[in-house]
Structure formats: C-alpha cells, structure tokens
C-alpha cells in the first residue's frame, strides 16, 4: 500500500463531480487500499477519491476508533473498514442533526453542518458486490460528508459567502506557513 498526496481546497478537482466506476477490479481495489492507508496516516475517518486527485466515485471509511455513544448506537454494529464504490444515499427519515465536522481537505477547520440522522446507502463493495447499508448517527454523517466530495461539495459550501471566504483565507495562511518551513 502507498500513502497518496492529499488535495486541499481550493484545488479545482474538489469541485468536480466524480465519474462512476464501471466495475471493482484489482486496480480499483489497490486504489481503495491506498486511500485507506492515506486516511489512517492522516488520522481521518473517511476519504473520497477526489481528495487524492482521482475523480472517481469511491469512498473509504473507518469509524472503529471513534468513541460513539449516541442513541444506543455502537460502532460494533458495523464492520470496518467500509469501501463504497458509486454510493447512492437516500434519507430514511427527515430527522436531521447539526454537528461540527472536520475534513482532511480543509485542515484545522471545523464547520457546523446539518445532515440526515438516518440514511440508506447502496454501493458496490470491495468485491464488486451490490450492497445496501442502513446507517445512522455519526456513520450516516460521515457517509454523507464523503459523498458530498463525490458531488464536488465541500464543507465550506455550507457557509455564507463571508464565512466561506474567511475559512479559505485561514486555510491559505496555514498552507503558506507550512510552505515557509
């Protein structure tokens, strides 16, 4: 496995709608393995292919190390890591929850986002098997966050123009400080 370079805002690839994958083959599995390694290396819980400069509809997730205690949901209900190709999300109920989210493509930013609390996601798994998963709470939030990346939507897109500009300016200063070292 390899650690891939992370793409950060405002890179234009993050604003493109990613292309569907025809079939999950060995090269797609290798990409997913590399994405997972990259996610772990950067202490993330989810990663979408556009975040590593690949415009394909692929996400990986692993919330197993996140301490989740909400609505009697435990992480042990899900088998991690999750590999999702061409995920399609459908809300199961209209109930939403608002919480702060971080993003590997927007380092050191935490942005409040309202998302569906309970979803159903249909996707091709690691072995090209069509799979349906019902998720709620933080897993539902993480899936929706990563699917946003596949649709060219970033966390800052949920902010007003003024707050979005401030967040991107902060990110620019962080990048400049890192570059100067």
Curated annotation (Swiss-Prot):
PANTHER family: PEPTIDE DEFORMYLASE
Full protein name: Peptide deformylase
Protein's job: Removes the formyl group from the N-terminal Met of newly synthesized proteins. Requires at least a dipeptide for an efficient rate of reaction. N-terminal L-methionine is a prerequisite for activity but the enzyme has broad specificity at other positions.
Cofactor note: Binds 1 Fe(2+) ion.
Keywords: Hydrolase, Iron, Metal-binding, Protein biosynthesis
Domain of life: Bacteria
Coiled coil: none
EC number(s) given by UniProt: 3.5.1.88
Alphabetized InterPro entries for the sequence: Peptide_deformylase (IPR023635), Peptide_deformylase_sf (IPR036821)
Top EC class for this record: hydrolase
Catalytic-site annotation from UniProt: 146
Swiss-Prot/TrEMBL cofactor(s): Fe(2+)
Keyword Metal-binding (UniProt): yes
Signal peptide positions (record): none
Annotated gene: def
Biological process, per Gene Ontology: translation
The keyword Protein biosynthesis is assigned to this record: yes
GO molecular function: metal ion binding; peptide deformylase activity
Reactions that this protein is recorded to catalyse: N-terminal N-formyl-L-methionyl-[peptide] + H2O = N-terminal L-methionyl-[peptide] + formate
Entry's family note: Belongs to the polypeptide deformylase family.
Positions of Fe cation binding: 103, 145, 149
